[in-house]
């Protein structure tokens, strides 16, 4: 590491002579372990020192933490964004950092910070990419590319399990057609969980409601754009409205649909904001 924070597990790693990774320990350990994240005041001071050095040397800094910088989900409204995220945002934006990576929520999301509603979309604001969980189909990871023109691109890719299975001579049909098998697996898993709550409505109605919820859930976690009008016109969604209008599951369904108004699987930081900027 190029530098380590003495009061946390945070550190700076130099990718090369022009790019640093600012790896931030956002976990809370004292007086007990917590789900919520927070950057210590002493760590913020250390970050300020490192970011000043980077600016003086013309270094591009990419900060990364486990906990989220921004509140990016209508479905999960607590324990995701860091408790002192406004302080962290202020510090990062003081140095005009354009991009932040995190996990924790593990719903594939890309969002720009806006100081207040109505701020022009073209105005500066740090953007956060939240990466979804590799363990949940479609088993995605993110590929970040520093391009020669100074731009930085991010795109999700799915682990090629089927390619690996063929290459290693596996005879397991689930691995050889992993994309199809994993989709059916997660669809059934979620549907079965929903049907544990949705009961006494008849086999066809319950199956339709569960399938609708599961389909939206899968697309939501994968960061795909969801056709809100199309979903709300399905028989399964109408069954939700008719049979369980006050259910928390319908509220979750609506939250996921509303959040998914755009695709979150590709992002381009243009060259004027990228790693070769002056």
Regions found by a protein language model. Give the residues of each.
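Active-site-proximal segments of metal-dependent phosphoesterases and phosphodiesterases across multiple
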Residues: 28-45, 54-102
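Extended active-site neighborhood of metal-dependent phosphoesterases/phosphodiesterases
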Residues: 1-45, 122-127, 152
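Short catalytic/ligand-binding loop motif for oxyanion handling, primarily in non-cytosolic enzymes
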Residues: 30-32, 70-73, 109-111, 136-139, ...
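Non-catalytic terminal accessory segments
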Residues: 164-278
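Short loop/turn motifs at secondary-structure junctions
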Residues: 18-20, 59, 96, 252
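Conserved beta-sheet core of the metallophosphoesterase superfamily
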Residues: 78-160
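Substrate-binding and catalytic surfaces of secreted/luminal carbohydrate-active proteins
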Residues: 47, 52, 132
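Divalent metal-coordination and catalytic microenvironments
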Residues: 24, 47, 63, 104, ...
